[in-house]
Amino acid sequence: MMSAPFHTHSTVAKIAAVLALTLASSVACAQDSAPAASASAPASTDAARAALAKKEGDVDQATLLKETLSAADKQYSLLKAGKQAVTYDLTYSYVGQQLIQANFTDDKLTLFDIQNTRSHTVTNTVSVDHGVKDNLTASVTLPFVSKYSQSETFSGLSNAFGDISLGARFQPFALSRDLPALTATGTLRLPTGRSPFKTIDGQGLGTGAGYTSVTLGANTSKVIDPVALFGSLNATLAWPAKHLSQTRNGKTLTEVRPGAGIGFGVGFAYALSHNISTTLSFQESISARTKLTLVDSNGVASESKTSMQSSAMLNMGLGVRVSPLTTVNFTVGIGLTTDSPDFTFGMNMPLHF
């Protein structure tokens, strides 16, 4: 009679022992899994930070913005003393327009003609910069121009060197974190390209301005990471082109006196990442009337003036850093006035030594 109760108590004890072991195992598993779960969150956060962190060869955004400014306009950059930089620029521009030619003699219209002109220009430019001092940089620019034109008077391709430019950039004040950078600039443009005033009508296109000019200006820039603001102002004076002998419409062009010009530009650059930046800028230049001296078949000289010209461009750019030493920049420009190119596209690739 006593065996049954003893067997029952033994069975209950065994079941209690099994439940105790199961509960202990569950508690231990919960305690072990809690640290693992809490550790997984920091691990995933660290992985995200590592993915967004600057990699080897990347630059900080301030440095990228300065390089972007240099690509947008080299007038905003300076080199350290003894340093050199070579830059290659490829630029394409398209101009399509209708030219109306009219000649009034004794209040009578003796000549009226409408010419449709389309011009495609590709310019390959190599620029060499040298740091004379930490705050003074000298430069020389050599362009090679390929121009194709379609018109009633001439349709063909012309290839020749353009006008060589000699320039200098000077920073009068040391850089400051609180104040914008200020740079004074000067450029001498020499008439080394094919002059448009010396080409034979219907036999070629000019690849240069045809006269010597000097441009003096100043610009300022301020990097406010991740944005850089910049602006410029300049004035241009030109020497007259004399001793010409170009015959057009029965008259001979003997002298050209270009008018003075002023220009300004504003814009900003924005760093999208450590290796990609964008720019948006506006540029405008205004030139006074140019005086032309013409001699007719009787040897009588007369003077004619062109209209004032205003050229405005809206430029959008993208800079991509492809290596620690090279940033490739692409620019698209849209003409806003009748004196501007209809469309421009440019690629800039600086190589630093």
Question: Where do the protein language model's features map onto the residues?
Answer:
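Outer-membrane beta-barrel biogenesis signature
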Residues: 31-108, 177
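Short loop/turn motifs that connect adjacent beta-strands in outer-membrane beta-barrel proteins
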Residues: 74-83, 118, 135, 173-182, ...
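Detector for outer-membrane/organellar transmembrane beta-barrel domains
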Residues: 81-97, 203-297
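Transmembrane beta-strands of outer-membrane beta-barrel pores
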Residues: 90-96, 142-148, 172, 188-194, ...
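Surface-exposed loop and membrane-interface regions of Gram-negative outer-membrane beta-barrel proteins
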Residues: 110-119, 132-165, 169-171, 288-290
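Residues that define the transmembrane beta-barrel architecture of outer-membrane proteins
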Residues: 120-124, 157-164, 180, 208-214, ...
